Amino acid sequence: SMTTINRKFSDSPAASLTPRHECGVCGIYNHTDSSKLAYFGLYALQHRGQESAGIVTSNGKRVLIHKNMGLVSEVFSEETLTSLKGHISIGHVRYSTTGASNIINTQPLMITHKGITLAVAHNGNLVNSIALRNRLEERGSIFQTTMDSEVVLHLMARATDRSFEEALAISFREIK
């Protein structure tokens, strides 16, 4: 039967070679309507993730975020997009590959550390995230989500005596 064929294919090594769409990320820089452009980018990428959507914008001084569970058209209204003022935006649509499907795991992730606000939108899986998370928790890190993407932010925060760029490079050397 067709069910048997599909089940056998999905268990075969060839199944891992087929393209799969897992999350969508877009970024806009130097545009006065960056949140609306990010919205349209996410709308076009929505086939890559229909669990949740989020946009972070910045004008270089303040950072604004709006994210929620649902389709892009359900998460954002014209009013919401108008309120997300800034010339820089990043957006994310999610299909969970790691972490539970709930509001806490929507992206972009946004943190403030040492007076610097950072937003991250990540597409993919970190192979060594469990080992890194365990190590970081043993050293006092407190995680807010179950996503592996949050590990990168904690690694960066540990490089307290480094510049942003150096902290990012150090964290990337540790992840796989």
For the regions a protein language model found, what residue spans apply to each?
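Conserved short alpha-helical segments that host acidic/polar catalytic motifs at enzyme active sites
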Residues: S1-K176
